[in-house]
Design a protein with these regions (language model features):
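Outer-membrane beta-barrel proteins
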Residues: 1-311
Length: 311
């Protein structure tokens, strides 16, 4: 028996010696950013706040013997582990991502917003009757993306185990033609199928077109709830941006949010600008919400400005 143990240990040691580690590069990143957001609101009389970037990222990337690339990404946000993501880029065979707290972004997330902006997306200003379409969630998310040759077509899918049981799934297809300056995409999600009311579905369709310094884009997104107690919501979002020069960009966007039982549609209008000066970047927007939550007369104005430094 002792001889058998010795042979087994010797074989194990030999296999360990024969295993070669993959060379990898480790990158540590941190953000330098300061922002101010102020809000004049009919509901609360106004609010304002200063915030700063507080995340540190660790990224490890290595190339395998067969040419594939493996990446591990971790983010510490406000002194806590926030996002973790493993990526395996298999070249022509596609890319696989598993994220805990970080979605792959290959499902409906990839096509939910074609609208150009010089700063934050318009749905970050408002749309209080519903958050924008979100796909399969961010906890235990498994995603896959494949570029179909040189056609400009990319297909993607992702899923996660839903807390109510079953799987939440999201899929998308996107077409990009850089020479024509045209992009188009559509996606769908089936969420919480075992929540007792048949689950929820999301759809998104959008397109954008670039002509010189101008870019225009639009999206139509819908969320349909299986529960009759929750109202379905439609979002329409469109806008235009103009690159004045290599450093300055301005944009204008409009978002409309309608809910089945709301008396009025909620509308958000945003004007934004961004400016770069070497390693320093400035950005900001002014956004106005009308009929917040579908209630006439409830209006908000939000002002945001930020400064960031690239290391």
């Amino acid at each position: 028996m002792n001889k058998l143990k010795k042979i087994g240990l010797t074989a194990l040691a030999g296999s360990m010696v024969a295993t070669a580690a993959t060379a990898a590069d480790v990158t540590v990143g941190a953000s330098w950013s300061l922002s101010y957001t102020g809000q004049d609101s009919d509901e609360n009389g106004g609010a304002a706040s200063w915030t700063m970037g507080d995340s540190v990222t660790f990224t490890t990337t290595g190339e395998l013997d067969n040419g594939w690339t493996a990446t591990a990404y971790y983010e510490l946000d406000d002194d806590e582990m926030d996002d973790q993501k493993l990526t395996l880029n298999m070249g022509d065979m596609g890319t696989v991502v598993f994220g805990d707290g970080a979605a792959g972004g290959f499902g409906i997330d990839n096509v939910k917003n074609f609208v150009p902006t010089a700063d934050s997306p318009i749905f970050s200003v408002g749309l209080t009757m519903l958050a924008y379409t979100g796909g399969a969630g961010t906890t235990g998310n498994l995603a896959y993306k494949l570029a179909v040759g040189d056609t400009g077509v990319t297909v993607g899918a992702e899923q996660e185990v839903d807390a109510a049981g079953g799987y939440s799934r999201s899929m998308s297809i996107k077409y990009d033609n850089a020479d024509a300056g045209f992009s188009f995409g559509l996606g769908t999600s089936e969420l919480a199928p075992d929540n007792g009311s048949g689950g929820n579905t999301e759809t998104a369709v959008g397109a954008s077109y670039t002509m010189g310094a101008f870019k225009i884009g639009g999206n139509h997104n819908e969320t349909d709830y299986g529960s009759t107690a929750t109202n379905d919501v439609d979002n329409q979002h469109y806008g235009v941006s103009y690159a004045v020069n290599d450093d300055l960009t301005i944009s204008y966007g409009v978002g409309n949010n309608s809910k089945d039982t709301a008396a009025n549609d909620e509308e958000v209008v945003q004007m934004a600008a961004s400016y770069s000066m070497g390693s320093i970047s400035f950005g900001g927007y002014i956004g106005k919400q009308s009929s917040v939550g579908g209630t006439a007369g409830d209006d908000d104005i939000t002002k945001h400005i930020s400064m960031s430094v690239a290391f």
